[in-house]
Amino acid sequence: MSYTNTKEETQIINIENNDIKKRKFIENNNTNNNTNSNTNSNNKNNNNNNNNKSNNKKQNNNNKKPRLKFTYDYNYKIISPFQKFLDYGICPTLNELYSEFYHILNENKCQKLKMELDELKKMNKGDKPIPIDFDPSKICHQHSKEDIEQIIFDPNDRHLIELAVRKFCGFLQKESNMVLMEMIILSIGLLKSIEFLHFTLEIERDGGIFTTVIPKSSPNTTTTTTSTTTTTTTIINDDNTLITTKDSNEQTSSSSSSSTAITTNTNCSNSKSSSQPITRRRTPGGVFYKLINLHIPTEFKSNLFSISSLFKYKNERKKKGFGTLLDLKDKLLDFTSNNSNGNNDNNENSQEQINSKKFNKLLNEVDEEFDKLCVSSKNEIMT
């Protein structure tokens, strides 16, 4: 026996079903609204976090790259030895280097510099160009090494250290081995570092340093060259003099892979070569580092010029904010007094003798550990 709902019961059931559907619809809408609101709030939070991160990055970048306002002043560039070096290749004097580093490391403390900049601004008032015949040296002052000796680096103050390192690297054609540069400045002192920088710039002005590199090959490999026309052979002696010989007859020359002879042939009919010497010019940074390397006693060289010491210093600086280094200010060798070739009465002549011959020979000597540091300057550990 089946039971059939009456009309009233059916209406009541339909109303209840409709109410249930409405409640479900409302619940679903509320859920969706809550989800959307949560999503929007999360998106806003993410955007805010991203903005905060970008702002923090900008602040960190500004902190990492300290800038001096006056060094970007047009008037300062007129009298800056560094700017004259960049624009015109003029090698600064030692006193000019003292002045440049004193000014950038003593921002807003040199009253004479402020007065000079004010005077230049008056001359350049109304955006009128300064006369071409203007001589900046008329109003420029210079600082001495006594002023530089008063500058003391605080290991916890990265601002001054980075300013000095960047200025040194700028003079050395944007040298990229900045960690090694920092180690040198803190170890041998700012004054000695500036003196070596001046020495390097003088060497570059006079033509630079060229090294002869012989590629590695098997010890039994020989070089045989047969020529039917003119053959020119240039041999580099130990004293860096050149001996040139010419032979128009047919000849055959044989040399081991360690030979320092550079042979140039025209119209060769039969040539078998393996390891020919390659002449390369050292970078200004390489000359600077090599000069310091030569003046450090052998027992202390590894404290600066080695991969292990470089990693050690960088890791210490990362953990503690600074690294430990030996104080080598009073341990540097003096080549001038020890190698004056018996001419002690005239220091200028002996210095010129050392510049042109002694260091040219010493800088060409191969030091594998040192060359690794120079060649690896593009590596991450050097930046």
UniProtKB/Swiss-Prot annotation:
Positions of region (Disordered): 27-66, 242-281
GO BP field: snRNA export from nucleus
Coiled-coil regions listed: none
Residue spans of biased composition, Low complexity class: 28-63, 242-275
InterPro entries for the chain: PHAX (IPR039047), PHAX_RNA-binding_sf (IPR038092)
Protein name: Uncharacterized protein DDB_G0292662
Lineage, highest ranks first: Eukaryota, Amoebozoa, Evosea, Eumycetozoa, Dictyostelia
